[in-house]
Regions:
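Carbohydrate transferase catalytic cores enriched for Leloir-type hexosyltransferases
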Residues: 1-177
């Protein structure tokens, strides 16, 4: 996200967004973005997103509950002409459920079914994950008018330009409860 914000493609304006299970729809993550970019507050709030045909929604974070709870809203976006993509990091909770907390496999399966139903495509962090998604879709994927696009990229780390954590935020006790 930081790289996209600092180096946006010429064709696009990058607007980080977020959703929770407690509210309907996605909101701009402007407070988060200002903090991430170390920018002064300029009065922009985390308002509900505005969208139009041709926009692209890229789900970078794995947030099972928020995505599955917002599936109807994502359908509204798609029906309005917004192209939707999600990053898939792995299928390990489904492939080897015994090494994850009980129920994680069902949660991951529900999330994957949701994104494969509403998305134009998924972008996987490796060719291996893309192959796993392709195989999973053969038996678990929803019926679609158009096939789900499956791409992949090499994930890596740029330690010099990363944003390291610096302890717990001031509102940690509220977040962790």
């Amino acid at each position: 996200l930081l790289n996209l914000l600092r180096n946006p493609p010429a064709c696009c304006r990058i607007e980080p967004v977020f959703a929770t299970s407690r509210t309907h729809g996605y909101r701009y993550a402007r407070k988060f973005a200002r903090k991430l970019l170390d920018c002064p507050s300029v009065g922009l709030e985390d308002d509900p997103i505005e969208f139009q045909t041709g926009d692209i929604f890229l789900g970078l974070n794995l947030n099972h509950h928020a995505v599955t709870d917002q599936i109807r809203y994502l359908e509204v976006l798609r029906n309005a002409g917004v192209r939707i993509f999600f990053v898939v990091y792995d299928l390990l909770p489904i492939l080897i459920p015994k090494v994850f907390p009980p129920g994680t496999d069902d949660l991951h399966d529900k999330w994957l079914k949701s994104i494969s139903r509403v998305s134009d495509g998924v972008v996987c962090i490796s060719r291996s994950v893309a192959d796993d998604v392709t195989e999973w879709l053969k038996t678990n994927g929803p019926k679609r008018l158009r096939p789900l696009k499956i791409g992949w990229f090499h994930i890596g780390a740029d330690i010099e330009n990363s944003v390291p954590t610096q302890g717990l935020p001031d509102d940690a006790s509220q977040v962790l409860n």
